[in-house]
C-alpha cells in the first residue's frame, strides 16, 4: 500500500494491524524536515520509503528568489507559491530563506549545478527518501534536463556543513507529516481547507434523545453499544460525555491486537470524531481517563495522549486495571465542555 501525508502514529497503526505499507508521500525540503524525525526512524525500521514532494518549496528554493525582495500577495500567482510562502513564514521568514539560498548558491557554484539541484540532492541524500517528486507546469516552466544533473554530483561534508549552518535559525514546523491539512495553522494556498472541500461531514450522525430537548447522542456501531445499551457519546447542553472506548472497528474488529500505543491512536481518533460529531472539538476536552491492561504500557500510551492533546492539557487519570475483555490493552473515556 502506498500512503500520502500519513503521520507517524497512523502509519504505525496500519503496520501494526498488518497492512503491507511500502511508501508514504510527504513534504520534505530544507524548510520542512518533519519527516526526518520519528517518521524516518519508523520507515527505516520497517523497510518503507518516503516519496518527497515540495522539495523546492514551490520554486522558492531556486536562483529566481535569491536576493529578491519578499513578494506580496499579488505576486504569488499560483497555488503552489501561495502555499509554500506560508511554510516560509512559519519557519522564520524571508530573511532566513535568503540565508539558505546564499548557502545553496555557494554549493551550486562549487559543483557547477543549479540551486534547485543542490536542494533536491540534499533531500535525496536523506536515508528514508526513495524518490523525489518535482512539479512542472508544461505551459510555463519545466526543467527535466536540469533535473538530470542531480545525479552528476554528490554533496561532500563541507557542503553539508554549510547547508546545516544556514538552517540554524529555522523554526521547525509544528506537528507531523500532513498536519498542515489537519490542524491550524493550515499551510495551504488559502490558509484554510476551502479549496479542498466545502465542508467536512461528521463521522457519526447525531441523534436526538426522545423526550430530552437538550440531549443528543452518537453511536459508533460496535456490538457492545447494542449489548450494553449505551451510546458512544452523549451531549447534554454544553457538556459531552464519551463512553469508555476501545480500539474497535465496525462491530467487533480489534485494531492493533497486542499493541497498546496503536490501540490508543485508534481510540483517540474515535473520541475526537464523537466529540466533533456532537459539535465540539479536541480543544473542548477537559478530562480523560485511561485504563491499561499493563502498567508497562503507560509511557507509550501517554506519549500518544500527549501528541494528540498538546497544549490542550486536559485533566487526566491513568489506571492499571485487573483485566480488559478480549485482546484490548487500552480503554479511554473523555469529557468535553463546549464554550460559546
Residue map of PLM features:
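Conserved, mostly hydrophobic/aromatic
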Residues: 1, 24, 43, 53, ...
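Glycine/proline-rich, positively charged
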Residues: 1-34, 49
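Structural preference for beta-strand elements that scaffold enzyme active sites
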Residues: 2, 20-25, 47-51, 130-133, ...
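Active-site beta-loop-alpha junctions enriched in small/polar residues
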Residues: 3-9, 27-29, 55-58, 137, ...
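Aromatic-lined glycan-binding groove of carbohydrate-active enzymes
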Residues: 35-79, 114
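Terminal-tail/helix-coil boundary detector
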Residues: 45-49, 69, 73-106, 110, ...
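N-terminal presequence-like segments and the immediate start of the first folded domain
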Residues: 58, 73-74, 188-269, 273-286, ...
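Acyl activation and transfer enzymes in specialized metabolism, enriched
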Residues: 105-121
Amino acid at each position: 500500500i502506498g500512503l500520502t501525508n500519513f503521520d507517524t502514529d497512523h502509519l504505525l497503526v496500519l503496520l501494526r494491524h498488518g497492512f503491507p505499507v511500502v511508501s508514504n508521500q510527504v513534504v520534505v525540503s530544507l524548510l520542512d524536515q518533519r519527516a526526518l524525525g520519528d517518521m524516518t526512524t519508523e520507515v527505516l525500521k520497517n523497510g518503507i520509503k518516503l516519496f518527497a514532494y515540495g522539495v523546492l518549496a514551490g520554486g522558492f528554493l531556486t536562483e529566481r528568489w535569491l536576493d529578491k525582495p519578499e513578494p506580496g500577495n499579488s505576486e504569488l500567482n499560483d497555488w503552489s507559491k501561495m502555499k509554500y510562502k506560508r511554510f516560509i513564514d512559519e519557519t522564520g521568514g524571508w530573511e532566513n530563506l535568503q540565508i539558505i539560498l546564499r548557502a545553496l548558491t555557494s554549493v551550486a557554484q562549487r559543483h557547477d549545478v543549479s540551486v534547485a539541484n543542490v536542494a533536491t540532492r540534499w533531500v535525496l541524500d536523506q536515508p528514508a527518501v526513495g524518490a523525489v517528486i518535482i512539479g512542472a507546469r508544461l505551459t510555463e516552466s519545466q526543467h527535466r534536463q536540469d533535473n538530470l544533473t542531480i545525479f552528476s554530483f554528490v554533496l561532500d561534508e563541507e557542503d553539508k556543513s554549510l547547508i546545516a549552518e544556514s538552517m540554524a535559525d529555522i523554526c521547525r514546523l509544528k506537528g507531523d507529516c500532513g498536519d498542515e491539512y489537519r490542524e491550524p495553522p493550515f499551510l495551504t494556498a488559502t490558509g484554510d481547507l476551502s479549496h479542498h472541500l466545502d465542508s467536512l461531514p461528521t463521522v457519526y450522525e447525531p441523534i436526538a434523545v426522545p423526550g430530552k430537548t437538550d440531549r443528543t447522542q452518537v453511536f459508533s456501531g460496535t456490538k457492545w453499544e447494542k449489548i450494553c445499551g449505551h451510546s458512544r457519546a452523549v451531549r447534554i447542553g454544553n457538556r459531552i460525555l464519551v463512553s469508555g472506548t476501545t480500539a474497535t472497528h465496525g462491530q467487533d474488529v480489534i485494531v492493533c491486537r497486542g499493541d497498546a500505543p496503536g490501540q490508543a491512536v485508534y481510540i483517540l481518533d474515535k473520541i475526537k470524531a464523537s466529540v466533533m460529531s456532537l459539535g465540539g472539538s479536541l480543544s473542548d476536552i477537559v478530562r480523560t481517563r485511561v485504563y491499561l491492561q499493563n502498567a508497562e504500557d503507560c509511557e507509550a500510551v501517554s506519549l500518544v495522549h500527549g501528541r494528540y492533546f498538546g497544549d490542550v492539557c486536559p485533566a487526566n487519570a491513568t489506571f492499571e486495571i485487573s483485566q480488559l475483555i478480549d485482546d484490548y490493552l487500552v480503554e479511554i473515556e473523555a469529557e468535553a465542555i463546549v464554550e460559546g
